[in-house]
């Protein structure tokens, strides 16, 4: 199990990403726009740098919804490989069965 503080930190990052997503996309659009003036583009870069560091989506880490484990995460289920296996063996994941050939 991951520490509670790590889970809380990830939750905080998720909130910040959601809060600043629109602002971040607007600023990035200005930065990429070649028709915008150099001054406007530079101002957009500076404003983007002023946003909180944790508001960047690349700072988020995929974690298991049950244990908080950061490695062996399966996006399709939102769980770590260990918990996916446990739930699959109990038959709690619809349509998932153990392979045999």
From Swiss-Prot:
It comes from the Bacteria. The keyword Ribosomal protein applies. Signal peptide: none annotated. It comes from Aeromonas hydrophila subsp. hydrophila (strain ATCC 7966 / DSM 30187 / BCRC 13018 / CCUG 14551 / JCM 1027 / KCTC 2358 / NCIMB 9240 / NCTC 8049). One of its GO terms (cellular component) is small ribosomal subunit. The lineage of its organism: Bacteria, Pseudomonadati, Pseudomonadota, Gammaproteobacteria, Aeromonadales. Part of the 30S ribosomal subunit. Contacts proteins S3 and S10. One of its GO terms (molecular function) is rRNA binding. Binds 16S rRNA, required for the assembly of 30S particles and may also be responsible for determining the conformation of the 16S rRNA at the A site. This is Small ribosomal subunit protein uS14. GO terms for biological process: translation. The keyword RNA-binding applies. SUPFAM superfamilies: Glucocorticoid receptor-like (DNA-binding domain) (SSF57716). Keywords: Ribonucleoprotein, Ribosomal protein, RNA-binding, rRNA-binding. Belongs to the universal ribosomal protein uS14 family.
